[in-house]
């Protein structure tokens, strides 16, 4: 791949500014520099001034509907990047997070770098997820996706808007369509 492709970090959020602040601070410290951040903010009340404190290339979209998969799809449509990095508004990452996802895509000639998410800070990655392998999971809170995948299989299915598992369905659809997805510990 291009040595430094543009990556859009996509974050839907809903009334979680206290957590989102740490997310943004983690993104400011990334070793990989060619990225922008698209936040689809569904909060009520919406706090536009919150975003002024961060030194990031930010595109903040206010969305009135409280619909997770609609928010992710809207950010995809707004992005100009070839790579989309799906992230959650309460996650924490190291300084090389984006860089490691890009390296995984490049090294394995993959379409998706499927990261592992842990429920608690300092939690242990399960042994079966502690090495690179063909992915059997897709977590929309930690995955880098080549835009070509979305052109091939479509966006997130909106029937999951009022429930979870939209990312699970997306991962199955990617697998069925022969998309190369690598589990990135």
Predicted regions, residues:
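Acidic donor-binding segment of Leloir-type glycosyltransferases
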Residues: 24-62
């Amino acid at each position: 791949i291009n040595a430094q492709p543009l990556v859009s970090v996509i974050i839907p959020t809903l009334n979680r500014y206290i957590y989102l602040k740490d997310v943004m601070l983690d993104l400011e410290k990334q070793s990989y520099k060619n990225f922008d951040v698209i936040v689809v903010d569904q909060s009520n009340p919406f706090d536009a001034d919150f975003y002024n404190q961060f030194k990031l290339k930010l595109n903040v979209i206010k969305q009135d509907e409280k619909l997770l998969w609609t928010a992710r799809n809207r950010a995809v449509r707004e992005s100009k990047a070839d790579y989309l990095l799906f992230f959650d508004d309460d996650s924490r990452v190291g300084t090389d997070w984006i860089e490691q996802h890009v390296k995984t895509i490049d090294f394995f000639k993959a379409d998706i770098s499927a990261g592992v998410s842990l429920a608690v800070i300092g939690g242990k990655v399960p042994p079966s997820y502690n090495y690179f392998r063909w992915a059997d999971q897709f977590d929309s809170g930690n995955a880098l996706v080549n835009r070509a995948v979305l052109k091939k299989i479509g966006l997130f299915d909106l029937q999951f808007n009022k429930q979870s598992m939209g990312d699970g369905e997306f991962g199955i659809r990617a697998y069925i369509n022969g998309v190369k997805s690598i589990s990135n510990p």
